Swiss-Prot record:
Transmembrane segments: none
GO BP, sorted A to Z: DNA-templated DNA replication
Species assigned in the record: Haemophilus influenzae (strain ATCC 51907 / DSM 11121 / KW20 / Rd)
Chain sites annotated for binding ATP: G45, T46, R47, G48, V49, G50, K51, T52
Alphabetized GO MF terms: ATP binding; ATP hydrolysis activity; DNA binding; DNA-directed DNA polymerase activity; metal ion binding
Chain intervals with Polar residues compositional bias: 484-499
Protein's recorded name: DNA polymerase III subunit tau/gamma
Family: Belongs to the DnaX/STICHEL family.
Amino acid sequence: MSYQVLARKWRPKTFADVVGQEHIITALANGLKDNRLHHAYLFSGTRGVGKTSIARLFAKGLNCVHGVTATPCGECENCKAIEQGNFIDLIEIDAASRTKVEDTRELLDNVQYKPVVGRFKVYLIDEVHMLSRHSFNALLKTLEEPPEYVKFLLATTDPQKLPVTILSRCLQFHLKALDETQISQHLAHILTQENIPFEDPALVKLAKAAQGSIRDSLSLTDQAIAMGDRQVTNNVVSNMLGLLDDNYSVDILYALHQGNGELLMRTLQRVADAAGDWDKLLGECAEKLHQIALMQLLPQKSSDNNEHFSFLAKHISPENVQFFYQVIVSGRKDLSNAPNRRIGAEMTLLRALAFHPKFLTAVPKANTTITPPPSTPSAVENTGNYVDVPVLSQSIKSAYSQAKPNKTSIPNLASLSALDALEHLTQLENQERQEHKAESLAVVSETLHHIQELDEEKSHKKMTALPVREMTEPKPKHIEKPTLPSNAAQAPQKNSTEENSSDDNVEIAQDEQEILSADTYRWEWSNPELAKADTGVCPSDIKQAILKDITPELRLKIITQTQQQDQWADIVERSGLTGFSKELALNCFLQSKTDDEINLGLHSEKSHLRQDRSIKNLAEALSKLQGKDIRLTINLDDSNVTTPIEYRRNIYQALREKAQNELQKDSKLQILLNEFDAKLDVESIRPV
């Protein structure tokens, strides 16, 4: 027998087989059960959602030999003939190819004849909106008052094109497009029945590409089966649909979260090398931000999601998620106006990166512990008096700026791997702490002395204010600078512009903020040797270390401990299995074992792994390991027995908790946290 495509092979044979559309199935079933049958039904909806299939099922219920029923037997001659498409009293008409009024009149001439075999003569007109205006006019009278043995079933994808006179004569049922979850679950059921291995992410992509159509999803699945040699894998589906690797959008979100321009540009270059679609890339980023926002709002539903999303949902604030989403969605609209689509995508992501909190706080705010006297009066009082305002020299500004610790010169410990940051910064700190401390104390002491003398000079100047001026007079354009005290005059003098000021409240914090906010300001290492020592370590590279949960060394450690705890896990590792066969073995547990027979248990939720090819490969590997033929049996068993894959997860979680506890108790790390006012990101700690 020739191969039959999935869309035809799995066409629903009863109302219970229809996926979704419960609101329509219920209405039709109740009408058949109570014998309340209208003479004309209109089924509308997008392609591939079941309009024709439901119409045929309804015709089967009308003409079943056992009577009008919502549950036709499917075994009688009438049911089989309708299913095979050769029932003489079911007239199917394609309105797209028979649009002329002559075709409609020929059809209506046969309405007067009673059904030959069945109980009702059923006219199924597909794509009825394609009929001409004259054809609709010819159909009106018969559609309004047909013989009692005639039923009209109309199907259309565009009900808006139907005349209102036709709509008013029919019962209208609109079929909804199915969501991705319904489609992916239906595909999983079909592939399980067909004994075809599949990966869940692949089915999600197929369901998304189907855009609500069951028929489209089955056609795409047929294509994926052919491309994957009877295996539906994530890579095959991605290549078939021309989709980008999920890692691209995930890496971009990591880069935006970290404020890591290097990782962002490297990822965009990888997308360009793969000839990716830039609009799709931004769309995938927006979709993943939507998933992250949902996980933040409904964390109890995040257990089945990718671990990357769980990490990002915990570490990106909801405000930043919304901001990144808005920037990316707006940027997609600008792609058509960009010089080319790559530049448009890059500028969109760089715009999101430019507002990252890391860059907004890169210029440190003044944290002055020395506050000028609060009673300083305004330079121009409301009475019209004004006084000269002393201006700090550049040397004093520079000295005070150097005295303030520059926190931006130390990478944020919360964004680094705790172990790497501890080892790296401890060495630098031990070398520079004593020298820095002595130097900073000396500069602060000198600055305090200068500021105190300036305050005294300022207080003295208040007593010698200039004559009173009327409020109507314009304010002076310039304010003369008095001679600085002798201690301040001894410092190196630099050219200083005269400031236009209407206020005598010149505070150290304001002066420092002007310096730090200048366009030419960039933070630098206070000790050049410290900058040289840091050139070998890139903060973004250190951050990446914690994002990789399992290193090769850690994987080997987990596998070794699993072998020690479970006999079946040890057999699996020694057998040399790979691919689907190994995945099946790791999800099984040992029920019984003899010299020539092994019985395994498999939880029912993993039943899709029990494929003939995988079982055959597993049996061959076990026979080769034992040196003789082994009879292998795999039974579905939901007993509470730990499988090797669950052992691995438990061991990894235990190692992770141990690493977190050890770091939280580490005395050196506590010193670093206190010294730099840092916080330990416990969720980012990974075992090694």
